[in-house]
Regions:
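Short low-polarity hydrophobic stretches
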Residues: 1-3, 56-57
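A gly/proline- and charged-residue-enriched helix-loop-helix capping module
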Residues: 2-48
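Active-site loop segments of alpha/beta catalytic cores
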Residues: 29-168
Length: 169
């Protein structure tokens, strides 16, 4: 994907996404970075042991909403979320499976916490309807949190903007 940056020092926006077909039939263009699953757990644990007096957070960070924007472009993703094509669900499942495997591997290390992020809010409100967030994204976040807790880890979630409409969830 190609990012367009209109202001120096500020992250850009995808203007030429990888997935351009409305049915997501070209989603095979997207590379799921399986190689990130090959890190050395023992090496991470040795590093953690050297910093036993510190609170250590894993070196991975699932961000499904932002990743989908990078892959599809913001406007196209918003349309997909309103009327999701079958290919969208298939890709989302594949991406979520990858993130779960990555978190499980990090959960095997001696870090104190796992983390995830997605920037959900504008200055005034959530970027999508809270009901769509609850249906599509909340179950993934729940899985990520469950992985952390099942391994005795804390989970941190970063988000920017006004997210008050989903905080009670």
């Amino acid at each position: 994907c190609v990012f367009t940056n209109i202001q120096r020092g500020v992250i850009g926006e995808v203007k030429h996404p990888l997935v351009t077909e409305d049915d997501w039939s070209d989603a095979d263009k997207v590379h799921i970075p399986e190689e990130y699953l090959s890190f050395d757990v023992d090496q991470v644990n040795r590093s953690c042991a050297q910093r036993a007096d510190k609170f250590l957070i894993a070196g991975c960070c699932p961000r499904p909403f932002e990743q989908l924007q990078f892959i599809r472009g913001t406007v196209n993703l918003y349309m997909d979320l309103m009327d999701p094509p079958k290919g969208f669900w298939a890709f989302l499942e594949k991406m979520h499976d990858y993130y779960c495997r990555l978190l499980k591997k990090w959960a095997q290390t001696d870090v104190d916490a796992l983390n995830m992020m997605d920037d959900w809010g504008s200055q005034n409100s959530l970027l999508i309807n809270p009901k769509i967030w609850e249906k599509v994204f909340m179950p993934m976040y729940r899985d990520y949190i469950d992985i952390a807790h099942a391994h005795g880890k804390k989970m941190f979630m970063h988000s920017d903007g006004n997210t008050l409409s989903i905080i009670p969830r």
